């Protein structure tokens, strides 16, 4: 089983300090933007509905399902936010709950420092350096390929859970060729984030198939988004192209949801974690295949959308 610990390694302390700095930077940028919106007469107090949306979507985000696709669907269904303001609202409102996820999982889930830093760095570099490459690729073809690959991986993991196929291990780190493989794949996943193709489910299945405990994926995938989202969110906040009430609702409802869901994930036995991987992977595969054949695509998460 994964070791949950509050004795922070030096690596974890540095990562947490950087995340706190990013949260402070984003919070200041958002506060300046919100004050300008209030002076312009835009209402700021979120309704109970908006807070409830934030709670539900961030709860499932913390479980690895993702928040942007469900939030987009709810916003459109209930007509809470105009379509043109949805990308900014998501990128602003979900930043601090995502940062909280990263802080919690890096603090309480012990992962080998070399593995954690290498995979965080590779995803981050992939999102920044790979953006110019993958944005020229056909998104529909990538979604189709990723969807089929995830379905195949979920079948293999389902067989493993049914003891019909060798199961993954419970390691908390990688070395040698396995680490190199993980870094390369995570770089590619980071690059694909710029197309709105999620990191969470592929990262969960990658870590599990390489013989690691699935819970080790949570600090990796949450940390990846935690380092990328504040920058994208700050840009949207500065532009003012977001709905203030809805964004505040995502924040207010999202924080307690993250705390509750993180406690559930931390306490899950390995057996149930492996079944969670199957559920998340199948969900992501269906979402990608549906997006590949739908006229409308899921709104990208400023380069960091999990699903």
Please place each PLM-identified region on the residue numbering.
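Small-residue-rich hydrophobic segments that form or flank transmembrane alpha-helices
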Residues: 44-127, 179-262, 266, 279-282, ...
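Short, Lys/Arg-enriched N-terminal segments with co-localized hydrophobic residues
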Residues: 1-5
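Membrane-interface helix termini and inter-helical loops of multi-pass transporters
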Residues: 7-8, 105-113, 160-174, 209, ...
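Alpha-helical multi-pass membrane helix bundles of inner-membrane/thylakoid proteins
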Residues: 39-46, 163-186, 296-307
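Transmembrane helix exit motif
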Residues: 21-38, 100, 131-140, 148-170, ...
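Feature marks short, highly hydrophobic, charge-poor N-terminal signal-anchor/signal peptide-like helices
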Residues: 6-18
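Loop-to-transmembrane alpha-helix entry segments
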Residues: 10-13, 137-150, 241-244, 268-276
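Membrane-interface module
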Residues: 265-280, 303, 307
């Amino acid at each position: 089983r994964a070791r949950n610990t509050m004795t922070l390694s030096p690596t974890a302390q540095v990562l947490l300090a950087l995340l706190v700095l990013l949260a402070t930077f984003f919070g200041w940028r958002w506060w300046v933007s919100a004050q300008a919106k209030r002076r312009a007469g835009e209402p700021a107090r979120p309704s109970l509905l908006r807070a409830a949306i934030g709670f539900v979507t961030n709860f499932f985000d913390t479980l690895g399902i993702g928040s942007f696709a469900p939030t987009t669907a709810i916003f459109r269904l209930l007509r809470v936010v105009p379509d043109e303001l949805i990308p900014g609202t998501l990128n602003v409102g979900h930043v601090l709950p995502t940062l909280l996820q990263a802080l919690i999982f890096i603090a309480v889930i012990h992962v080998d420092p070399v593995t954690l830093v290498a995979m965080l760095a590779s995803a981050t570099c992939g999102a920044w350096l790979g953006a110019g490459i993958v944005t020229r690729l056909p998104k529909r073809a990538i979604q189709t390929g990723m969807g089929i690959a995830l379905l195949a991986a979920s079948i293999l993991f389902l067989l493993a859970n049914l003891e019909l196929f060798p199961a993954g291990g419970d390691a908390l780190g990688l070395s040698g060729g396995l680490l190199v493989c993980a870094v390369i794949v995570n770089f590619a996943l980071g690059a694909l984030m710029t197309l709105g193709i999620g990191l969470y489910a592929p990262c969960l299945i990658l870590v599990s198939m390489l013989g690691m405990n699935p819970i080790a994926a949570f600090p990796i995938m949450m940390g990846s988004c935690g380092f990328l989202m504040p920058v994208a969110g700050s840009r949207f906040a500065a532009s003012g192209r977001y709905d203030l009430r809805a964004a505040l609702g995502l924040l207010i409802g999202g924080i307690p949801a993250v705390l509750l869901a993180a406690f559930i994930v931390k306490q899950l036995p390995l057996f149930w974690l492996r079944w969670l991987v199957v559920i998340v992977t199948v969900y992501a595969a269906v979402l990608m295949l549906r997006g590949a054949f739908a006229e409308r695509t899921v709104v990208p998460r400023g380069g960091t959308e999990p699903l």
